[in-house]
Amino acid sequence: MQSKYIWLNDKLVNYADATLHFLTPGLHYGVAAFEGIRCYKTARGPAVFRLREHIDRLMGSCKVMGWRQLPFDAAQLIEACRLTVQANGFQECYVRPVVYQAEGGWNLTTDAGKPYVGIAVWEWNGYLGAEAQEKGVRANVSSFTRHQPNVMMTKAKIAGNYPNSVLAKTESVRLGFDEAIMLDTQGMVAECTGENIFVVLDGRIVTPPEGSILCGITRDSLLHLARDLGHEVTAQPISRDQLYTADEVFVCGTAAEVIGLREIDFRVIGSGRTGAITRSLQEAYHAAVHGNHPRSAGWLTRVESDGRAGRTLDDHRVAV
């Protein structure tokens, strides 16, 4: 089903009419903050996964970007996301809110103009291919290094950060791989182009520390789910050679969900298929996003209006 409407500065406009001027500063300089969010079909209707956490991160990205005042607060953006999904009639979709420099900014400062906000939704059919979750995918260690935090603010999801990922992913695909693993400036594992990474070493789940990575909402979800399942989880530096000798390696992100890596740099990882721990986390995550997990109530925001805009399914959580 085609998207019908896009939300722009508090108005739903027809999909075809949601256009930008060629000289929009955010287009030229990457001065935009955004989020990638998923809406899933549940027994109680469509619901957005961890919407509040995504919008909180968006607000943090805007603060890092230097905007002193935004046209909408977090509660209004949560409601706008819900309304946009509802207006388009989707049961499952991808949700993309963007805050961008729309006016001024030619002197390379966010103080010269003002930000606008848009929210788009579209149907989502998977990111790394239909067989990725079952069989896992192939990855390489990229020749491109992940940003150092004082070069590009790595905790902010900012458009200008993403050419780093585009270069690495393009190289990876042209070499015949599905995804790229990026190292930090110290040569330790950071993350993939659009996902965080986990490694299973001697039965322990290990993930890189927060230093140079974008702290993913899916990553945070898996940390909770893994501990719920009784797994030991540690954030610690991971070397490149530990990737090759790991029992399992898996990546996670809003778009990819949870995907095993069956091969890295032509080296088979574990059994060469999605491992048991990865599989258990896939199942727990899928249950959570579809409303079938004990954590679902606190993590899902219903799309259908119940008079309490933006409230989660958990009636005990405070409404925004």
Locations of the language-model features?
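Helix-start/capping segments and mature chain N-termini
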Residues: 1-72, 76-83, 105-320
